[in-house]
Amino acid sequence: MKFGLFIAFAFPLFALDGVVVNVTTGKPQAGVAINLVQPSQNGMNQLGATTSGAQGDFKIDKQIPPGPGLIQATYQGTTYNMIITPGTPTTGVQVQVYDSTKKAGVAKTLEHLILIEPGPDNIKISETFVLGNESKATFNDPAKGSIQFYLPDSTGGKAQVVITAPGGMPIRRPPVKTPSAGIYKIDYPAIHFLRKGTQ
């Protein structure tokens, strides 16, 4: 019994509540899938899940071990992340989402860099795209992708793709072949950001 009480105090009840706001419309957003996860050595541990209500409200009552948590809000095919660090208020949290669009021109290529590094047996080519999106919408076109690029047949379609959003962690994605010969795409949303960033 004492052991059970000790565990209860060591891992206090973590009540997370707040509202989801659609920045595109400026209104609370209903029907957004909310997941509370925590990073671990074995990946992400899901701690709780819910869906935002009619007024965009959500609440998750869950015990959480010490350390940061991560709110993942999925809306119109895009997942928005918000880190909850120890000591950060967990009530009245505002999670922001955006309407998604396939409209061309919402996300723009600000820079396109190619680095060629010759080696003893091969040539390493690094291609970098810097995207910008200053609209109040997320560019998300799974059919065409956010970026398309060419890979020679000699690569066998093998390329390392790393996506880094402003203030975010690097994310690896496999290139996806399109119907056009040698053309591959990256299916990853271009989320709104005001300052130049990389993706």
Annotate each language-model stretch with its function.
Residues 2-13:
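Bacterial N-terminal signal peptides
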